[in-house]
Amino acid sequence: MASSGGELGSLFDHHVQRAVCDTRAKYREGRRPRAVKVYTINLESQYLLIQGVPAVGVMKELVERFALYGTIEQYNALDEYPAEDFTEVYLIKFMNLQSARAAKRKMDEQSFFGGLLHVCYAPEFETVEETRKKLQVRKAYVVKTTENKDHYVTKKKLVTEHKDTEDFRQDFHSEMSGFCKAALNTSAGNSNPYLPYSCELPLCYFSSKCMCSSRGPVDRASDSSKDGRNHHKTMGHYNHNGSLQKTQINSFKNSVACPGAQKAVTSSEAVDRFMPRTTQLQERKRRREDDRKLGTFLQTNPSGNEVMIGPLLPDISKVDMHDDSLNTTANLIRHKLKEVISSVPKPPEDKPEDVNTSHPLKQRRRI
């Protein structure tokens, strides 16, 4: 550092306030006009030099003002430092460097008791140990920031690859489901109303039957031959996707190939989709009647109020009050509650025709 006097306490070059930069672009200008000044770690310091403090005995107020930005270790006035008339120069040391940065940024060029403060770093007051510690802290911060940045870049790359894989799987699902739906649409007039033609959808049908083998026997000879033939067609259709897509298709073709077809051929939803409206209503009515008959058949309770399915739950254990009088009172209350619950009448189940006829017709207004 070059200095005008060459001794500690004289005016250093880095203490001089720079002029405001007039060549800065408009979009880069802030609310306050500033000079072009780059601070490296060797120029920053925990020591701050405050110039332009009015010489009216306001050291206490000055320290209280700077203490808002961090803990202050020491402060003193520099009487030998060259200053303007009727002003004083103070040196303040903060506990850490971050507090000194904030104090300099906030208090520089601020009005204080009628004077304009000029705050600058004073690294020349640091000892060798303080400088070594400052550099070590800065080095650790740089290492941590670099590691976080590398971790973020790696994570972003992994997320991008995972997103590409999910997009491919979603496209593959949609295309295969569309292929299965097209095969179901062309399978009108099949002898089995719950399944399409076996020659139209051998791959999906065979894979679904392999995954759900408990539903019934599978004709492995015919289905395997048809599956192989249609599998080559499907793989030929997706050859343009590249070697990566081929590997993914081979890895999960049994679990991903046609999940929509399994749901379509195993449930009656596919049948209802292509049935007329009247047939659907008749089917629903038949199901309701079957459920009603099944409920009547499962009524094992003589009272007919409950339907017993499966093992009975354990009864609620009675609480013992450890007193005959209290137990008698509790039993009376329980019996009374049972009588009240059993005596509540159930609302009559009226048919829709009866409900419609029970309401009186609205009379016309006489004019």
From Swiss-Prot:
Residues 46-124 form the RRM domain. Signal peptide: none annotated. Residues 217-243, 277-303, 339-367 are annotated as: Disordered. One of its GO terms (cellular component) is spliceosomal complex. CDD domains: RRM_RBM48 (cd12442). InterPro entries: RBD_domain_sf, RBM48, RBM48_RRM. Keywords: mRNA processing, mRNA splicing, RNA-binding, Spliceosome. GO terms for biological process: mRNA processing; RNA splicing. Belongs to the RBM48 family. As a component of the minor spliceosome, involved in the splicing of U12-type introns in pre-mRNAs. Component of the minor spliceosome. Within this complex, interacts with ARMC7 and PRPF8/PRP8. This is RNA-binding protein 48. The lineage of its organism: Eukaryota, Metazoa, Chordata, Craniata, Vertebrata.
